[in-house]
């Protein structure tokens, strides 16, 4: 095997190691698994990634990831359209969906605010949220940001921003440890946090 090929394989391993939850050892295992049967495994993965890249878009209403401009959640007639859960990223949206206990709508912020940084709050898509609250006659807004310092900072900022709207504002409750992120919690814990949510002021 020549030096160029070595570098190419090292680059593949490096790219895998940058994926969440994967270290260098796991990245090497994945690369080896794909390369040992590249005509089937590697090409199949590449073809799927190319197709996904063509089809995946952000929902123009909530910011979810889907294959349609309006995602399946926003377009569903079975969702409770009087409740919106505010999440930091699509990962938290998926965590709440896995719990099977939330039947409302979502608003994906895409970011959070850090008390130590000077981030512009406009990154949170809050004008769009407020517009939705008025246009869709939202009765309750559930702030489902993570229990990290950044998540708490973001939650307080959202509460202040939504003061002009009469919707009830609540926060996910017990079971979410300080510093915890929804995506890493089991479905039962997320369900309990949704059911036991508290008013947030």
Swiss-Prot record:
The protein's name in its UniProt record: Recombination protein RecR
MF GO annotations: DNA binding; zinc ion binding
One GO BP: DNA repair
Record keywords, A-Z: DNA damage, DNA recombination, DNA repair, Metal-binding, Zinc, Zinc-finger
First and last residues of each zinc finger (C4-type): 59-74
Toprim domain sequence ranges: 82-177
Taxonomic placement: Bacteria, Pseudomonadati, Pseudomonadota, Alphaproteobacteria, Rickettsiales
Gene: recR
Family that this chain belongs to: Belongs to the RecR family.
InterPro entries noted in UniProt: DNA_Rcmb_RecR, Rcmb_RecR, Rcmb_RecR_Znf, TOPRIM_dom, TOPRIM_RecR
Function: May play a role in DNA repair. It seems to be involved in an RecBC-independent recombinational process of DNA repair. It may act with RecF and RecO.
Pfam families, A to Z: RecR_C, RecR_HhH, RecR_ZnF, Toprim_4
Keyword Zinc: yes
PANTHER family, per the entry: RECOMBINATION PROTEIN RECR
Regions crossing the membrane: none
Origin: domain of life: Bacteria
